[in-house]
């Protein structure tokens, strides 16, 4: 079932990386690794994508026979697809792993929600005996698909990690391995959190922004915006262009947290609407000043 590799010996990054799913994120992992001289094995259900990726990026197919050659395996697909792949290949991952020596490929995902994926992945890893760490690269564009992937997509980007509930020594070992394995991709900052905290915060920082942008362009006035719009319109509508299948799955998997954020936003917008309907300039000015003050404080905190 292939050879067992020890990620710890490959200082500076992996020698071989496996990628499951060659969309924007998976394709960017593949291109980034290939550009750094890392051998890339991959699998994607679309034969045309595999053919395109084989031209200078992917060296071969990732399967049960070859996954043991990898130092890291990146699951870059939708939540249910990640879980399904792990369930199908759990035994092969176990066969490629020596838990006594902490050897074998470390598996990470790139899914935008962590709760549903990490719960099942940690369970499978514990039952079968392989290593999994939840991960979420905070990078992307409004486009999707391998054609839009870039080798430099993750340069300077944050990477959020969700380790399993294991003893501190093993947790530090796994986190260290992941950081070493993604080094060639140029991530700028690493954060460690729990799956529940990740999903609570990401509902605000990412999912809500997509909902707001997507809803904003549904105004009938959007049909006549040309010639009247500049940076504000462009910034607010950038992520209205999205992958509905992927984002609906992510949002449903984080439904409670996202619904909370939407309801809170509706309440805030209601205050602005009341001020306008009442022609209450002082109240409106206070609302605007409050938002400005909060944003400045957040920016100052981030700068320090």
Name every feature range the model reports, one short phrase each.
Residues 151-238:
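Internal alpha-helical scaffold of NAD(P)-dependent oxidoreductase catalytic cores
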Residues 13-16, 104, 156:
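Phosphate-coordination loops involved in phosphoryl transfer and adenosine-cofactor binding
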């Amino acid at each position: 079932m292939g050879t067992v590799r020890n990620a710890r010996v490959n200082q500076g990054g992996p020698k071989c990386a496996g990628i499951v799913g060659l969309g924007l994120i998976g394709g960017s992992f593949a291109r980034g690794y290939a550009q750094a001289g890392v051998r890339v094995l991959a699998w994607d259900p679309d034969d045309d994508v595999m053919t395109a990726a084989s031209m200078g990026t992917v060296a071969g197919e990732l399967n049960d026979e070859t996954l043991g050659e990898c130092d890291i395996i990146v699951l870059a697909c939708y939540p249910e697809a990640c879980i399904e792949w792990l369930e199908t290949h759990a035994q092969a991952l176990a066969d490629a792993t020596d838990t006594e020596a902490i050897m074998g490929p470390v598996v990470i995902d790139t899914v935008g929600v962590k709760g549903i994926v990490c719960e099942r992945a940690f369970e499978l890893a514990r039952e079968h005996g392989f290593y999994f760490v939840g991960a979420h690269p905070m990078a992307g564009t409004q486009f999707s698909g391998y054609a839009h992937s870039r080798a430099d997509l993750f340069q300077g980007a944050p990477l959020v990690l969700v380790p399993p509930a294991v003893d501190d020594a093993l947790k530090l070992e796994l986190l260290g391995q992941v950081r070493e394995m993604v080094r060639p991709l140029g991530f700028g900052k690493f954060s460690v959190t729990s799956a529940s905290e990740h999903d609570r915060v990401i509902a605000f920082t990412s999912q809500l922004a997509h909902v707001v942008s997507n809803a904003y362009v549904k105004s009938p006035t959007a049909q006549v915006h040309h010639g009247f719009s500049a940076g504000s319109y462009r910034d607010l509508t950038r992520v209205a262009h999205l992958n509905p299948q992927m984002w609906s799955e992510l949002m449903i998997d984080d439904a409670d947290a996202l619904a909370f954020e939407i309801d809170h936003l509706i309440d805030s917008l209601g205050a602005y609407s009341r001020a306008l309907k009442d022609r209450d300039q002082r109240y409106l000015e206070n609302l605007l000043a409050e938002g400005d003050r909060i944003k400045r404080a957040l920016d100052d905190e981030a700068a320090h």
